[in-house]
C-alpha cells in the first residue's frame, strides 16, 4: 500500500471555464470535431531555426534568412522509400549559404553546405533545389500540391515554450528582471502528477512508441494543419478499405501518402501498408493522441500576464485543466474500495495514488441524465499522453467506425480489460479513469455489432455481455451526489447465461458524452 500522505488543500476551479451545454444537444463525433478544429485553427508563422546538424548552427550571428527553410518528406512503400530532405538559406557574417541534409527518416543522413557570393545566388540555389525535389515553386508554396514521386512539404509551427524572464527597458541599456515565482500550492504527489501529464519527455516517448518521427514533428511544433491532412489521408484509406475487391496497390499508394504527411520512423524496415480495419483504427487513435498532445502543448503556450510575481509553473499548468484533483488518503474508505476493485479485477498492477476528480461544468452536463437509475463505477484506460486533454475536455466519442460495439465511449467492469488500452511512460507508470456511467436500461448483446451509433429505441446504453463478470453478489453500493452507484468488489466468475458470448470480458457502451462523469484518476505501476 502507498505510504500515508496529506490531502491537498481544497481549491476552486478557475472562473470563466467552458460553459455547460444543454444535455439535449446532439454531441459531436470526436473525429469530425477534431478535424474541423484543426483545419480552422489559425495558421501560425514559425520562427525558423538552423538545423542542429549544420556547422553554422553554433555561430553567434548565424540565422535562417527570412523564411527560407523547409522540411520535405517522401514515403513510397513499394520502393521501400521513407526519406526526408531539409533545405535552408543561412545568413552569417554578411555572407549567405544553402544547407541541404537528406536521408532515411530517423537517421542523420548526408549533408552539403554551399557558400555563395550574393544573396540572389543563394536564393536561386534554394528555389532550384525546392523545385527539383517537389515540382512546386517556392513562391507558390502556400498552395503546395503534392506530385507523384516527389517530396511533400511538412508544415510545423512555433514552439510552445514560455519565457520566465521579464525584459525591462532601463535608462540607457536593456536589462532582464527575473520574476518572483510563488511557492507551489499543490501537495507533492499532485505536483508530480501535473509534471507528468505535461512532460515533454512523456509526450516524446508516446510519439516514439507510435513510430512517429519526433525529429520531423518536434514537441511544440506540431502543425494543426499537418495533423488535419493526416486525418484526411486516413479518410481516403477508409474508403479504399471498403471497396470490393480491395486493391493492394491503391492501399499502398494511400498508405505512402499518409506516412509522407505524418513522418514515421521504421528504421530500415519497409513501411507497412495500412491494409486492415484494425491498422486503420490504430492510426486514427494515433492521430487523436497527436491532436490531444497538441491540446496540452497549446494550453501551456497560453500567454502569461507580464507581472513581477507569477504563480508556480505547476500551479499554472494545474489551473489550465479547469479541474479539481483531490489526493485520497490511503486510509480512506474510498481508497480501500478502489484498491480492492483493482486487486479483484486487475492483473499484475500496483496502485500508486488515487485522486478524486471534479471537472468544471461536467456535473451540470451529467444532470441531464438524472432520470437514469442504473449506474456503475467503471474503468476507462487511455494513453498517459492524452490525460491532460481528457481532464480539460472530458471523455469523447472515439471514431471506431469498425469497433466491436460501434461508435461510443467504451468502459469495463474488469480493470484488466481497460488496462489493455493504457499507454505507459518509459517507467511503466500508467493512468486510468474510474467513471460514473449512467447506464439506465442496457441493451445486452453477445455478438459484435460494429454499426451501432446509439442504443436501440427503449434502451439507454449497450452492454457487451462477457463470459466472465465480477461476482455480482460482491457489488457494493455507494452514494455519489445523491445517486446510488454500484461498484464491483468481487473476483470475475463465469456467467452461465453468456457462456457462448463472443466477448470474454464485459464492455459497457454509451453514445452520449454527457452520460458519464469522471470520478477518480488512478495512477498504477504496470
From Swiss-Prot:
A single GO BP: double-strand break repair
GO cellular component, one term: cytoplasm
Region span, Disordered: 1-55
Coiled coil: none
Domain PARP catalytic: 312-526
UniProt cross-references to CDD domains, sorted A to Z: parp_like, WGR_PARP3_like
EC number(s) per entry: 2.4.2.-
Record key words, sorted: ADP-ribosylation, Chromosome, Cytoplasm, Cytoskeleton, DNA damage, DNA repair, Glycosyltransferase, NAD, Nucleotidyltransferase, Nucleus, Transferase
Reactions catalysed, as given in the entry: L-aspartyl-[protein] + NAD(+) = 4-O-(ADP-D-ribosyl)-L-aspartyl-[protein] + nicotinamide; L-glutamyl-[protein] + NAD(+) = 5-O-(ADP-D-ribosyl)-L-glutamyl-[protein] + nicotinamide; L-lysyl-[protein] + NAD(+) = N(6)-(ADP-D-ribosyl)-L-lysyl-[protein] + nicotinamide + H(+)
SUPFAM superfamilies (alphabetical): ADP-ribosylation, Domain of poly(ADP-ribose) polymerase, WGR domain-like
Gene Ontology MF term list: NAD+ poly-ADP-ribosyltransferase activity; NAD+-protein-aspartate ADP-ribosyltransferase activity; NAD+-protein-glutamate ADP-ribosyltransferase activity; NAD+-protein-lysine ADP-ribosyltransferase activity; nucleotidyltransferase activity
Transmembrane domains' residue ranges: none
Residue stretches making up the PARP alpha-helical domain: 183-301
Short name of one Pfam family: PARP
Cited PANTHER family: DNA LIGASE (PTHR10459), PROTEIN MONO-ADP-RIBOSYLTRANSFERASE PARP3 (PTHR10459:SF66)
Family: Belongs to the ARTD/PARP family.
Role played: Mono-ADP-ribosyltransferase that mediates mono-ADP-ribosylation of target proteins and plays a key role in the response to DNA damage. Mediates mono-ADP-ribosylation of glutamate, aspartate or lysine residues on target proteins. In contrast to PARP1 and PARP2, it is not able to mediate poly-ADP-ribosylation. Involved in DNA repair by mediating mono-ADP-ribosylation of a limited number of acceptor proteins involved in chromatin architecture and in DNA metabolism, such as histone H2B, XRCC5 and XRCC6.
Name of this chain's protein: Protein mono-ADP-ribosyltransferase PARP3
Amino acid at each position: 500500500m502507498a505510504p500515508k500522505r496529506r490531502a491537498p488543500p481544497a481549491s476552486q476551479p478557475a472562473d470563466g471555464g467552458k460553459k455547460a451545454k444543454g444535455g439535449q444537444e446532439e454531441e459531436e463525433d470526436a473525429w469530425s470535431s477534431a478535424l474541423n478544429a484543426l483545419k480552422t485553427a489559425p495558421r501560425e508563422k514559425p520562427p525558423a531555426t538552423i538545423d542542429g546538424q549544420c556547422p553554422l548552427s553554433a555561430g553567434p550571428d548565424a540565422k535562417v534568412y527570412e523564411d527560407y527553410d523547409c522540411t520535405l518528406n517522401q514515403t513510397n512503400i513499394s520502393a521501400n522509400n521513407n526519406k526526408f530532405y531539409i533545405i535552408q538559406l543561412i545568413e552569417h557574417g554578411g555572407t549567405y549559404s544553402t544547407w541541404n541534409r537528406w536521408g532515411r527518416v530517423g537517421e542523420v543522413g548526408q549533408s552539403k553546405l554551399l557558400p555563395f557570393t550574393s544573396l540572389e545566388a543563394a536564393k536561386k540555389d534554394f528555389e532550384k533545389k525546392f523545385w527539383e525535389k517537389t515540382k512546386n515553386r517556392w513562391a507558390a508554396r502556400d498552395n503546395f500540391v503534392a506530385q507523384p514521386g516527389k517530396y511533400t512539404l511538412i508544415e510545423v509551427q512555433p514552439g510552445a515554450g514560455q519565457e520566465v524572464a521579464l525584459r525591462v527597458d532601463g535608462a540607457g541599456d536593456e536589462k532582464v528582471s527575473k520574476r518572483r515565482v510563488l511557492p507551489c500550492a499543490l501537495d507533492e504527489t499532485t505536483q508530480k502528477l501535473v509534471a507528468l501529464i505535461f512532460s515533454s519527455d512523456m509526450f516524446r516517448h508516446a510519439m516514439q512508441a507510435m513510430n512517429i518521427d519526433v525529429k520531423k514533428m518536434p514537441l511544440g511544433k506540431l502543425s494543426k494543419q499537418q495533423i488535419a491532412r493526416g486525418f484526411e489521408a486516413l479518410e481516403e484509406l477508409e474508403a479504399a478499405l471498403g471497396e470490393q475487391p480491395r486493391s493492394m496497390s491503391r492501399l499502398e499508394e494511400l498508405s505512402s501518402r499518409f506516412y509522407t504527411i505524418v513522418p514515421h520512423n521504421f528504421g530500415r524496415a519497409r513501411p507497412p501498408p495500412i491494409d486492415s480495419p484494425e491498422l486503420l483504427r490504430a492510426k486514427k487513435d494515433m492521430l487523436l493522441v497527436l491532436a490531444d498532445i497538441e491540446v496540452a502543448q497549446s494550453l501551456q503556450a497560453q500567454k502569461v500576464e507580464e507581472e513581477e510575481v507569477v504563480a508556480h509553473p505547476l500551479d499554472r499548468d494545474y489551473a489550465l485543466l479547469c479541474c479539481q484533483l483531490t489526493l485520497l488518503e490511503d486510509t480512506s474508505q474510498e481508497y480501500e474500495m478502489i484498491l480492492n476493485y483493482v486487486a479483484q479485477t486487475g492483473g499484475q498492477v500496483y496502485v500508486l495514488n488515487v485522486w478524486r476528480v471534479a471537472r468544471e461544468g461536467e456535473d451540470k452536463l451529467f444532470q441531464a441524465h438524472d432520470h437514469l437509475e442504473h449506474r456503475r463505477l467503471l474503468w476507462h484506460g487511455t494513453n498517459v499522453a492524452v490525460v491532460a486533454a481528457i481532464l480539460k475536455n472530458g471523455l469523447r466519442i472515439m471514431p471506431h467506425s469498425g469497433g466491436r460495439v460501434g461508435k461510443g465511449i467504451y468502459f469495463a467492469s474488469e480493470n484488466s480489460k481497460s488496462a489493455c488500452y493504457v499507454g505507459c511512460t518509459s517507467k511503466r507508470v500508467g493512468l486510468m479513469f474510474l467513471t460514473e456511467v449512467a447506464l439506465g436500461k442496457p441493451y445486452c448483446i453477445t455478438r459484435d455489432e460494429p454499426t451501432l451509433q446509439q442504443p436501440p429505441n427503449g434502451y439507454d446504453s449497450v452492454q457487451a455481455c462477457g463470459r466472465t463478470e465480477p461476482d455480482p453478489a460482491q457489488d457494493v453500493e455507494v452514494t455519489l451526489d445523491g445517486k446510488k452507484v454500484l461498484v464491483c468488489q468481487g473476483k470475475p466468475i463465469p456467467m452461465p447465461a453468456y457462456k457462448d458470448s463472443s466477448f470474454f470480458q464485459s464492455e459497457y457502451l454509451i453514445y452520449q458524452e454527457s452520460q458519464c462523469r469522471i470520478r477518480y484518476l488512478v495512477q498504477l505501476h504496470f
